[in-house]
Each structure stands twice: as structure tokens, then as C-alpha cells.
Amino acid sequence: MKKNFKALTLIILILNALCGHAETKKGKPIHSIIPAPVSYISSKGKFSIRPGTAILINSSSKELSKLAATLNEVLINYGISPLPVTTLQENKQPANSILLSVDNYNEISSAEGYILEVSKKTITLRATTGKGIFYGLQSLLQLMPVQDNNKSGLSSVKIPACKIIDYPRFPYRGMHLDVGRHMFPVEFIKKYIDLMSMYKVNNFHWHLTEDQGWRLEIRKYPQLTETGAFRRSSPIGRNAGDDNIFYGGFYTQEEAREIVEYAAGRYVNVIPEIEMPGHALAALASYPHLGCTGGPYEVWTMWGVHDDIFCAGNEGVFHFLEDVLTEVMDIFPSKYIHIGGDEAPKTRWDVCEKCQQRIKEEKLKDSHELQSYFITRIEKFLNKHGRQIIGWDEILEGGLAPGATVMSWRGTEGGIAAAKMGHDVIMTPGSHCYLDHYQANPAGEPFAIGGFTTLKKTYSFEPVPDVLSEKESRHIMGAQGNVWTEYIKTPAHVEYMAYPRAIALAEVNWSPRESRNWENFVGRLVVNMKRLDLKNVNYSKSAFGVDVGMQYDENSEKLKAVLKSDLPGAEILYTITDKNGTSSERIYKAPFEINAVSIIKAWLSDRSGLPLKISERKVWHNDAFGIKPLLNTLYDHRYQANGNISLTDGLRGDANSLINDWLGFLGEDADLIIDLGGEKDIQNVSIGLLHNPGNWIFMPAAVEIKLSEDGIKYTEAGGIKPDIITPSEPGGILYSIINIQQKARYIHIKAKNIGNCPKGHPGEGSKAWLFVDEVLINTGL
């Protein structure tokens, strides 16, 4: 009964949300506004926007007139003709009117804050700036019913009576887009900005330059776009080969200005990023004298980090960058200019005569301090022109430039260090804010860079680390979602990866920490998904899928299938297909046993009102199924899946994800023993092996099988030699089947790590990874 009550509660929550309501944990009604406002108090009745309603503004400013026009544009979608816009007379608001008022209101302390009051007779939206009015309008628009554009005109639009007091928690609320790896049309960039502004996101971080392409026209240096904007090919998968397809493009200065102006109209600041000193190969290919070796260089056709960077000992590099930044500042009025600063190998600097001379002349300790010199020099130039720098957290290395803002991506540690030093920080750790990561089981997702960042995980992010004092915490400006595009080629794919996780992060950035509630957020998100449908946004429904996994029951000593959802109380339905056919649809109530090779399909009940997302997983039942192996070597803690049982849980690892099912061994062999519990006639043994050189993962040098009757004395029973250990394709999986045809109780399997990355590999000489997964044993029984 308890589970049924939870399911009923969720259904009521969703149905309320579909009517514009959701329930907070305190039981007070709140409408489907994202981000959740600071305060929402409901009243009785509704205001009807209808022909005859007037929009009033308290001044004749162009800004307020444009904001009134924004409201009219939305009402047209409801079939309501544009309402007349007039200036408020005698400071009295008549009935049947909507007032947009900007003034020095004492009760509104934030420039982005607003107070929205809806009664049966009037709507009043007050703020101290046009920006506050704009954000108040976004909340007002989300109070309106979801209406398909012009398909059924309404005689009126009803808004529930309420009072909202609202302002942001953080001043910086960002979204990022990498156009260096893959580029996207101007119209899509505008759509991206539209979606940001809907959810009160106020900074667009535009990553414009990379090793793989320079994307902004610089008129003084035309080769940057004539040469640097194009590459001869792109990688296949994770650097598994070239596609031999010429790729490139760039934004003209006119297009960039157009985007800046468009964003400004939606109160979004555009922050350009010009990478330095690393990720500069496209610039070096255009002007080889800017590198330490002088070239020749080409725009890079692989993903990753390249050793060739701007030469810090070459005075011409600084002249070049100052010229570039001068044109950039002319296009972008942003207070902040992002200069990158990340992933800059010191390989070339350490042997470059000019760089070493610079270190000597400036009395620097090493190449890390040389990077600090580089960044500080660029900062001084930008400061002189009234701008400030933002850099990735590597700019901490060797000493932080005096006024730099740090963007902390390698966890939160860099941000903590910078805040303790008195520097402003934008939190964007990969664990929660990298929206190019997988958001659900990789087997059912588009190919991605890796990682595993669910919607719920993004929503759980707290930008202010507990270790910071109150004073230090004030330096946390907010958080940002990053979309890197190595494996994202189309606008639709960008939308799929960014949404709805960007919406979750928007609430993290805006709403009070104490008001965040996952179940309530989901209720409001359902309504917003319908709004995204109307805007043709290809958002992901993965958060509404079901995780199909296996769990070892210590009491029964058996493996059982477990179905989980991130949505509390949601009813899960499933079917099982095995040798006997497909079962009827069942309601999941508890973990269940699997007794044959099976395919499990699971989804959330449509009675919940949630989007349909079917999850599917094959379970490879075999004679090793559920037997905990004994491991003689320890896997690396970074790739431990579910521990030893991961090797015999019936779930095969996916080549696209390194986290969920694989055990990773760094420089070590995978050495394990399986006890079948009694002597059996073993026909064959199979083990899963991953080959992914781009991530320093290689096939083993050999796989050896030994058998024993007593667990003490072992005899060789077969194996695979290196000459036949080749996956079907680069970056693929080999499920090796080793013929045995012998009786035994104990099976000893050793996959021998090659030791170090081979000659010619970027990691040459470093420890190699060995990844192993499912062990299948067939006894013919």
C-alpha cells in the first residue's frame, strides 16, 4: 500500500503541474515556474487577458516599450490580437490592465529582481531595471497555460492570482557552447540564447578558437579564417581514424555583432573565448612563426591536447594576441573576456631557447611561472581597456594573475583555492556541469565523450563548497553548463545533450538553496517540456527512463534484476523476453531472479503523465552468473563498476562508456579465479576485453586459462595469443571465446596487461590500461 500511495502522490503532483500547479515539500501550491521563485503566495481567482485588456508602462522608454512588445508576441500565439500599449496616467492603474513599472523600489534590492502581483482585476510587474521586468515576464509567461501556436485561438488567457517576490541567488548564470570542434549556424546560436533567457540564464560563453578550428573573423589576420578555420578531416570516434571529410567555417564580424545584439535584447551577455597559450594549433597553422618550432603546422585532425602552443618567448606572439583582442573587444562589449589557459603542455617551452631566455630575463622559476607571466601580461592589456579576464583553473598554476576570475572545471578544488585567495570563481566541475557527458545508460544514448551526469545529478549540484567561510563564499559568482562538441555535430544533438540538464542548472543558479526539491522540480519540468515541444527543441527524455541493473543479494547469495527510476514513487512496468517468449506487462515491485539469457524492457507507467522512454538491457545468463570471482590483482578505484561481481552479473560493458560495467587495471594484469561450486564439464570460456587506444586502453598481451579440481594445483587449459587478439574495429570490444572441453571446479583467468603504451602512441612509456568485463562460462548444462 505504501508504494501505491507514493505512486498516487507522484501522479497527483504531475497532474497538478499540468494544470499549472505543483506541490512543494511544505504542501503549498506553486505554479510551474522554472527557476522556482524565492516567494510565491497564491490567491483566489484569476486574471483574464482578453481583447480590451491594456498594457501600461510607467515611462515611454524604448526598453519598456520593447518589453511590452515581447508580451504581445506571446499573446499572439494564443490567438489574441496585440494589446494596446500606453503610458500610465496619474500613477493610477485601471482595472483590466497589465502594468510594467520600472522605478527605485526600496523593497527590490537586486537589479535582476522583480515583484509580480496578479489579482482578478490587474497584473502589476515591478522592478528597478528593464532586466528585472524581463525576468518577471518569463515567470508570467510560465503561469500561462501551455498553448499550441495558433491551433486553437482562445477568447482569453487566464493567469492565477498570486504574488511573487523573486531575485537570483547568483549573479553569474552561464551556458557554454564550443564551436571550435564543430560549428553551428547563426540561427541556432540565436535559438540557444532564446532558451537560455527563458530560464533566466544571463551569460553565453562562446568558445570560438581551438586546435581544430578558428571560428571568428579577425581582419588584421585573414589567414586565421582562410587557413585556420578549416581542417582536412575529423576523427572517427575517439581518435580511431580519420573520416577524410574537409570541414570548417567561421563567423564574420557582422554575424558576431548580430548575435551580440540579439543576446542583449534578451539580457544575455556574450563572453568570447580566445584560447591561449594552448589549444592554438589552428592559429599556428595560419601563422607558423607564432609557435616555438616555427612549424610546419596544420589545423589538428584529432581530439585531445596538442604539444604545440603559442611561444611565450616570442614578443610577436603578444603583439598578435593584442591585435586579435583589440578586434574582439570591438565586437563584444562584455566586461569579461575568456582567455582559456587550460591544457597547455610545457613540452615545447621546456626546450625552446626563446622561452628559456624569457624565464631567465623575468627571473621566473620554471615553465609554470612562465604561463603565469603569459596570462598576467594579457590581463594587464585587457585591464587597460576596461576588461577583465576569465580563465580555466589551470591559470592558478605558477601564480594567479591579480584580477583574474577562475572557471573551475577540474572539480571544485581550483575554485576553492581561488576563492580563498580572494578571486571570483565560476563553478563548472565536469562531474555535474559538463553536459556533453552521458546522461543515461550509454547503450541507449548517442555516442558521447564519456562521463555519466544524470539530470538528477546536475540538479543536486551545490556551487558553494562547505569548506569556504562566509566571506570566501561571496567570491562564488555562480555556475555554468558546458557543451563541448567533439562528438556533437548538429544543432539537434546540442539540444539533446543540453536540455533538460541546462534547466536544472538554471534552477541551481537562481533559486534559494533551501527551496530546491527534486520531486517538485520534476513536476514543473513536465510542463516545461511541453513548452519546449512548441519550440521544436530536441530535448532528452532520458531522465524518464528506467535503470536496468543487477544486484547481489547477500542473504540468498543470488543475483537479482533491479529496476530503478530517479523519480520517487513512479510506477515501473517491464517485460522479460527469453527462450520461452515475451512475458506479459508487469508492475515492478521488488528485485527478481533471472534464470536464462533474457532481454528486459522497462518504462514508467503512462498514468504518471511522464514522457515515454523505454529502457532495454540484455542479461547474459550462464554458468558463472552470480558467482563472485576472487581477484588476485586490484582494479583501479576510478573504474570499479560494482566491484568483483561486475565480471559475472550478466551485463556486458558498452564501448561508449567506461564507468558502468568495466573493471579497469592500470599497468596491472587482470587475474581472477571463479569457483563453480563443484566439478563441471567446461565447454568454453569467454571474457570481454576493450580496445580504446584513444583513452590509453589496449588489448592484453595474452589471455591464459588454467583449471583446477581442488583450487591448489592448476593446469593450463588454453588461451589467446597476441596475434589473434584484435577487435573487429578500432575502439571496439572483443568477446573472446576460448574452447576448453575439460572438467574442473576452479577456473583461473589471467589477462596480461601490455604494461606501457606502445611506441608512437601519445602516451608512449606511460602505464597502459586494461579493461575487462563479463566472464561467461558454458558447461553445456
Predicted regions and their residues:
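Active-site neighborhood of glycoside hydrolase catalytic domains
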Residues: 301, 305-402, 409-417
